């Protein structure tokens, strides 16, 4: 849910400059930035979240063809950016290479983890995959390698072409990106024209290196492609809540299906409202870090669960068996924990707050009603 809010704000950050440069329509700051991002309310982010919610409630589904076209648009935009930015790289723009040291690199890694959210969805197809022992690692690792190469090329092109040194506070410490402190520092230090203060970094880079018209194509690509990301995130989340309600972990009203559109409209509208509210008031940096906290905790739990099941259920049928689990598992635990600790204080506090509320809700409401309670679960036939 929070990840969908972050992408909604990201869409807004490209949409506002796009219509400003293309049609000379300027949305004031207080209507294009959330309260905690230096404005009042992010209307474009609310609009796109509301639109996607409506489409989901009406039963609109992405076809494989449409999704493939949108993926091609995203890839084409990144390839175009790299083709224009990489040739004008200046090595001086990488000096100093790590101005905030290893802690700065770690903090950036914790934030950029948001770019890798969703790769785990490939694993859900293990039972439907031919020879999963061979093909699942190829799919997961292959997609990770390809996307990481793109991330490196894009980041290298952006930083190398125009430079991107961090914005520091009065004490010389780096400021968490995307929040009101960053906005204030950018204004006070007159750095709104720099890459680190830009809301649309790739389009900003192309304008700075002499491609203003092409920069609009990048904004247009984001305008067209990002809503599909929001849709898929919200689709998955609503189905998770629907399944939890069906298992009686959440109120039964969330299992209602619309008689005409045959969609779980109640849970969709509630989820969409939460996405809209978060997108309306919070900056993309805080939302992404908050989403990372929950995702890292989920990955940590999965790694721990796999190791426990490997010990307690040795004979369990496994369409895909994690290789070298006693090496991969501990490395995953350490990596997730390290990245979580490097997240912003705000993200960690929000995570612990929501986790506490979830545990209380489960103890008071869900535990007694759940059909997953041991007394309701029928043992599997060993045959």
Locations of regions flagged by a protein language model:
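Alpha-helical transmembrane segments of multipass membrane proteins
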Residues: 53-54, 82, 155-156, 223, ...
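C-terminal membrane-solvent junction of multi-pass transporters and transport-like membrane proteins
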Residues: 37-41, 52, 99, 253-265, ...
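Membrane-interface loop-to-helix entry segments
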Residues: 12, 40-88, 99-102, 140-144, ...
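Membrane-interface alpha-helices at helix entry/exit sites of multi-pass transporters
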Residues: 132-143, 249-269
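Hydrophobic transmembrane alpha-helices that form the core helical bundles
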Residues: 1-49, 53-57, 222-243, 277-297
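Select transmembrane alpha-helical segments in multipass membrane proteins
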Residues: 44-48, 100-112, 207-231, 264-277, ...
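Transmembrane helix-loop junctions in multi-pass membrane proteins
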Residues: 55-61, 90, 214, 250, ...
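Helix-loop-helix junctions that connect adjacent transmembrane segments
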Residues: 23-45, 68-220
């Amino acid at each position: 849910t929070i990840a969908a809010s972050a992408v909604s704000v990201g869409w807004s950050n490209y949409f506002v400059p796009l219509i400003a440069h293309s049609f000379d329509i300027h949305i004031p700051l207080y209507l294009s930035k959330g309260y905690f991002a230096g404005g009042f309310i992010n209307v474009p982010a609310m609009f796109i979240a509301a639109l996607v919610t409506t489409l989901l409630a009406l039963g609109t589904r992405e076809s494989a063809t449409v999704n493939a076209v949108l993926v091609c648009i995203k890839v084409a935009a990144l390839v175009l950016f790299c083709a224009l930015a990489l040739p004008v790289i200046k090595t001086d723009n990488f000096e100093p290479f790590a101005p905030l040291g290893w802690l700065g690199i770690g903090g950036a890694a914790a934030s950029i983890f948001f770019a890798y959210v969703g790769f785990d969805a490939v694993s859900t197809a293990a039972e439907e995959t031919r020879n999963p022992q061979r093909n699942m690692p190829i799919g997961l690792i292959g997609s990770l390698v390809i996307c990481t190469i793109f991330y490196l090329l894009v980041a290298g092109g952006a930083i190398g072409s125009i430079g991107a040194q961090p914005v520091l506070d009065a004490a010389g410490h780096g400021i968490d990106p995307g929040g009101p402190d960053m906005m204030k520092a950018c204004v006070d230090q007159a750095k709104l024209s720099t890459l680190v203060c830009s809301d649309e970094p790739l389009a900003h880079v192309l304008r700075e290196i002499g491609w203003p018209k092409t920069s609009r194509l990048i904004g247009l690509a984001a305008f067209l492609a990002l809503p599909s990301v929001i849709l898929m995130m919200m689709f998955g989340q609503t189905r998770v809540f629907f399944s939890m309600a069906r298992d009686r972990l959440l109120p039964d009203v969330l299992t209602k299906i619309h008689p005409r559109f045959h969609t779980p409209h109640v849970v969709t509208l509630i989820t969409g409202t939460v996405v809209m509210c978060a997108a309306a008031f919070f900056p993309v940096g805080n939302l992404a870090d908050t989403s990372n906290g929950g995702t890292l905790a989920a990955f940590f739990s999965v790694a721990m669960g796999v190791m426990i099941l490997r010990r307690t259920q040795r004979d369990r049928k496994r369409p895909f068996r994690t290789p070298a689990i006693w090496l991969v598992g501990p490395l995953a635990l350490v990596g997730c924990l390290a990245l979580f600790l490097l997240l912003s204080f705000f993200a960690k506090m929000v995570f612990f707050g929501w986790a506490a509320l979830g545990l209380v809700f489960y103890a008071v409401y869900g535990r007694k009603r759940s059909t997953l309670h041991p007394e309701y679960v029928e043992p599997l036939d060993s045959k």
